[in-house]
Amino acid sequence: MTAPLTLLIVEDETPLAEMHAEYIRHIPGFSQILLAGNLAQARMMIERFKPGLILLDNYLPDGRGINLLHELVQAHYPGDVVFTTAASDMETVSEAVRCGVFDYLIKPIAYERLGQTLTRFRQRKHMLESIDSASQKQIDEMFNAYARGEPKDELPTGIDPLTLNAVRKLFKEPGVQHTAETVAQALTISRTTARRYLEYCASRHLIIAEIVHGKVGRPQRIYHSG
């Protein structure tokens, strides 16, 4: 069995980093979740805790995450990096890919998509640690993890077609906006269930997810029709 991992979130917006951490805590396989708000803190935590996976934002108060990524590559750091950034320009994407990032997620991140990334990461790590020599099929599975998707006619575990259809109907009209709480109230389901369906819809580009910062309190995740 693969040993639990330490995961480091490098994100300067503390409430957003805490939202990511809260989601990841419900995913098995990560024993410790650390938060760093800038590159200096990230370097210190990497040196001290040796996280197996780093969720790295690109634009930080004291520099760019891509520069830290280059440092890790030059140091032959054994952990993996997932870029979590609003930078969708192809130059940054290409640079990150050349550095060997495990995945590249554009903000606002759909948590269903983040969950898929973390699941693939754990599966690949388990395969690398559990076998001494690999067959071509196993190598193909490792390298084709990004290309494989769920069959179009199949839904992932925990997504019921009737409930999914009910959620999608709430967004029929242009400009409709909901939160997990309003969907939960409308369909008489729990907020956790509502959030799961909303994140699934966002990951399939059926709706759009955004983070809205209020004057006080934590940022709120809003979902709306395109």
Swiss-Prot record:
A GO BP entry: phosphorelay signal transduction system
Gene Ontology CC: one annotated term: cytoplasm
DNA-binding interval(s): 180-199
User: What keywords does the record list, in alphabetical order?
Assistant: Activator, Cytoplasm, DNA-binding, Phosphoprotein, Transcription, Transcription regulation, Two-component regulatory system
Annotated Gene3D superfamilies: 3.40.50.2300
4-aspartylphosphate sites (modified residues):
D57
Q: How is it modified after translation?
A: Phosphorylated and activated by DpiB.
**Major site of localization recorded for this protein:** cytoplasm
Q: Which GO terms describe its molecular function?
A: DNA binding; DNA-binding transcription factor activity; phosphorelay response regulator activity
Domain Response regulatory, by residue range, is 6-122
Q: Which InterPro entries match?
A: 2C-system_Tx_regulators (IPR051271), CheY-like_superfamily (IPR011006), DpiA-like_HTH (IPR048714), Sig_transdc_resp-reg_cit/mal (IPR024187), Sig_transdc_resp-reg_receiver (IPR001789)
Query: Where does this protein reside within or beyond the cell?
Result: Cytoplasm
- Tell me which SUPFAM superfamilies the record gives: CheY-like
The cross-references to PROSITE patterns, in alphabetical order and at most eight, read: RESPONSE_REGULATORY (PS50110)
Highest taxon above the source species = Bacteria
What PANTHER family does this protein map onto? TRANSCRIPTIONAL REGULATORY PROTEIN DCUR-RELATED, TRANSCRIPTIONAL REGULATORY PROTEIN DPIA
Q: What does this protein do?
A: Member of the two-component regulatory system DpiA/DpiB, which is essential for expression of citrate-specific fermentation genes and genes involved in plasmid inheritance. Could be involved in response to both the presence of citrate and external redox conditions. Regulates the transcription of citCDEFXGT, dpiAB, mdh and exuT. Binds specifically to the dpiB-citC intergenic region.
What name does UniProt use for this protein?
A: Transcriptional regulatory protein DpiA
